[in-house]
Amino acid sequence: MTPSKLSGLKPFSAFLLTTAMLTVALLAFQPAALGQQGKGASSDDWFIKSAKDRKEQLQQGIKGGEKRDIIPSVPGSPIPQTDRLKPPSPDFLLAKVKWGKAAIIGDELTQDWNLAPNDMLEFHKKARSKGFKYMPTQTAIQDFSFNPALMPSILLGGVRELNFSPEGINRLRKYVLDGGMIVCDSVYGSPWFYESAKKLFDDMFPESRFRKLPPDHPLFHMVVDIDTASYSCGGEKEGGKPFMEGLYIGSRIGVLVSKYGLGCGLAGEMDVFEKLEANGLKPMAYSEETARLIGENLAPYIIGYGRVGEAEGKAELFGKLDENAPTSEFIFAQVKHEGAWNAHPGAARQLLMQLEKDSAIPVSLKRVSIDLNRDDISAYPFLFFTGLDDFVLTHKQIDALRKHVNSGGTLVVNNALGLATFHQAVVREMRRAFPQSDLALLPHSHDIFRNLNSIKRVKYTPTLMKDKGEQLQGRPVLFGAKVGGRLCLLYSPYDLEGGWNEVRYPLSRGYQSASAKQLGCNVIMYAMEH
């Protein structure tokens, strides 16, 4: 409304209208601190570029057929291991995805995806110093191949809300299921980006959900041990520990989200946080030192667990609960629970094929997934339970497990990757379910080690050998508990299932393939005979 029109109003009305207009104008220029606890009024408040693009170039990457180091087997002690690449081999490891809107900041065009323009330059410099000859690159989502063999992982970084078209969402989902990895960096710790990323991928993968990575997760120990973390801003709630969240696809992280910004720390450009705080925002980011340590571990994790993704990404046909299998046919029934219950897709089928080959037992090669909260499990005397981290059984699940073992069934529990958090959860939850039955180490003379295969010595993974080789002395380790005088609960604290897949799981604490299959077949035989 123009001043001439204002003058035609009654004085009091004109006063009210002028006051209202001034109020709106003042609200528009409120500092971001008036947003929710430093969140800002909108994600646009976070849209500040951290530094200018240095536009440095690295030398050319590796070529198809060239030899290179793969990954260290144990933290701090790289084992030289070369592998001839199958041409064409990717020259790229982690591509920065172009997404979001553009704006002019100062005299420079800036976009959501590139607020920390030098992060991938420094990430790849560090990776190349460790022998990984990959090149930094960028890709628009519409130009992306969505082929993990050509691009093992992609980076989505930003501060504003992450969103994609339905077609893009479907293609990203398939990319992850096929073995690709998506890394989401909130750059400055923007809650707008962080919350939208978690929602986007939670909706994209309804069969899984984000979980906090446990302290002994391979990502924190691939090359360097990240037992503690420092933060340039925020992080008070983490107690000096790293905080990362992953959405598991099998045993690998399909989508990794960093609530605390990584990009500025990777690039060594931290001045932007003072600007954000001056605007009333509360940024959250790792220190330069911790961000670079995470980056140092991320490169070998992508490579090593990319190979896991290739193996576990193959389609698996599950049996159905209503299929009337012959009563003499062995059915591998696996328990679904709130944790990462499907840690090694395809592994059970590999074991069952071995069992079918080595014995006269009729075997169904389709495993069945069981929900203890609602499914009738009376037709399945063998239940398999595995996971990667913490879980809590419901009262219904506990009742179902008690009924199962009291009816003559057997429960076999496996610690996928051999992580401490899952072990602690198993001990706690089995004590809740069977308070009168304690897990005890089975003696090496037990029948379970000599029914189908005579097992006196086993081979463990390099990480477990480094940690406990002298203590284990090559002896198989199984714990068991009796209910009503019958051994019906078996627990492997070291990963048994991973060895069935014949794929290398970096930093896994478990059995190597041949030993895992022999022991797995013996466990099934014992369960069927008792």
Locations of regions flagged by a protein language model:
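Structural recognition of the beta-strand scaffold that forms the well-ordered cores
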Residues: 95-96, 152-156, 181-185, 210-212, ...
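Aromatic-Pro/Gly-enriched surface loop or interdomain linker
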Residues: 35-153, 157-160, 262-263, 270, ...
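Short alpha-beta junction capping motif
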Residues: 153-194, 298, 382-423
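Sec/Tat signal peptide C-region and signal peptidase I cleavage site
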Residues: 29-35
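Extracytoplasmic/secreted envelope proteins and their assembly/folding machinery
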Residues: 117-124, 169, 173, 194-198, ...
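N-terminal secretory signal peptides that target proteins for export/translocation
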Residues: 1-13
